[in-house]
Curated annotation (Swiss-Prot):
Record localization: Cytoplasm
Entry keyword Transcription regulation: no
Known function: One of several proteins that assist in the late maturation steps of the functional core of the 30S ribosomal subunit. Associates with free 30S ribosomal subunits (but not with 30S subunits that are part of 70S ribosomes or polysomes). Required for efficient processing of 16S rRNA. May interact with the 5'-terminal helix region of 16S rRNA.
Quaternary structure (record): Monomer. Binds 30S ribosomal subunits, but not 50S ribosomal subunits or 70S ribosomes.
Identification of the protein by name: Ribosome-binding factor A
GO cellular component: cytosol
Length: 119
């Protein structure tokens, strides 16, 4: 990713996080965290990765984000000085969930090892 792409991605990440916190009134979107933004080389499309902070229905949150995409893009255009605001695509980030699952499995295996050694 070029420096310009990274700067634009960082700007979009920062502004969208702020807009979701202050401007969007949909309660399904109040408990999400933006984890990363990836932008195309031509700066026309941005993938916004998010994770859920609480046990929420991922499909419902995705539906709410898809519905709010146009509104968020409009707010982003007002909040930034970008010549062209990229199309936004929201993608659920499973990496955090996967990391928790791996940690759990490792802990369980270590506990099993400890109990086997003490028997």
């Amino acid at each position: 990713m070029s420096q310009r792409q990274q700067r634009v991605a960082d700007l979009i990440h920062q502004q969208l996080a702020e807009l979701l916190k202050k401007e969007v009134r949909d309660s399904r979107l109040s408990k999400i965290s933006l984890t990363a933004v990836s932008i195309s080389p031509d700066l026309k499309q941005a993938k916004v990765f998010y994770s859920l902070l609480e046990n929420q229905n991922e499909k419902e949150v995705q539906k709410a984000l898809n519905k709010a995409t146009g509104y968020l893009r409009h707010l982003l255009a007002q909040a930034t000085v970008l010549r062209y605001v990229p199309k936004l695509e929201f993608v659920y980030d499973e990496s955090i969930e996967r990391a928790h699952r791996i940690s759990f499995l490792i802990e369980r295996a270590l506990k099993k090892d400890d109990s086997d050694e003490s028997s």
